[in-house]
Structure formats: structure tokens, C-alpha cells
């Protein structure tokens, strides 16, 4: 295990799956704060925040449209206003469309690329 004492960690897509596991591991490793983002299920995000806090870390859940630059900027501003820094960023948010390649519509492909490529780029840049 590693130590994250005093570190502020942000995990996009941290309200479920691998993102949730990483967020909880950061809390278990002594992070000062773990911030998670969610897209649709605020109640699940709140539940994860409560789990994070059982390990002594502060938590915050922020709604994020990962493909939207304004949403990303708002998220970063909220985190910096509350914690003044971000030490660890995990670009975990992502989407997929379950379909055969021939059945994927152009709009679906554009959405996938916006969330999975554009989102991490802008989160890292901001």
C-alpha cells in the first residue's frame, strides 16, 4: 500500500466500479480528501462519499459532464475553492456503446470520443 497523507485526490467516474475502488483505496491510504464525480446517480455518489469518510478522509461528490469544458472548469473551481489544490487526478470517467462495429452510429462514436478522449485531456489541462 502507498501513503497519501495530506493529498487531495480527484477521481472522475468515482461513484462506481473501478473508480469507486480507487477512491476508497486513496481514502484507506490516508488521503486528506477524495473527490469523486458522477454523471447520473447522485445517491450512489453520496453513498461512496460516506464510505470514503469512514476512513478519515474528507469527501465531495460533483456532477460532471466529462465531455463539456464548462462542466470541467466548474468542477476544478469547486475543488480548488474547497481544498485549494489537486494532487492526484484519475481520469476514470468513460462510456461505451454495446453494439457491433457496423451498428455504431456516428453520433454514438462522437459521444464516446468526447467523453473518453476529450474529457481526460481537458481535465488534465485544467
Task: Give, region by region, the residue ranges found by the protein language model.
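Conserved glycine-rich Rossmann-like NAD(P)H-binding loop of the short-chain dehydrogenase/reductase
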Residues: 31-47
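Conserved glycine-rich cofactor-binding loop
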Residues: 8, 15-17
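Substrate-binding pocket helix/loop in short-chain dehydrogenase/reductase
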Residues: 100-101, 105-113
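The beta1-alpha1 cofactor-binding region of Rossmann-like NAD(H)/NADP(H)-dependent oxidoreductases
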Residues: 42, 63-75, 106
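A glycine-rich helix->loop->beta "capping" turn
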Residues: 55-58, 77-91, 97, 108
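Flexible N-terminal pre-Rossmann segment of NAD(P)-dependent oxidoreductases
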Residues: 1-10, 28
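A short, exposed helix-loop element centered on a Lys and neighboring polar residues
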Residues: 124-125
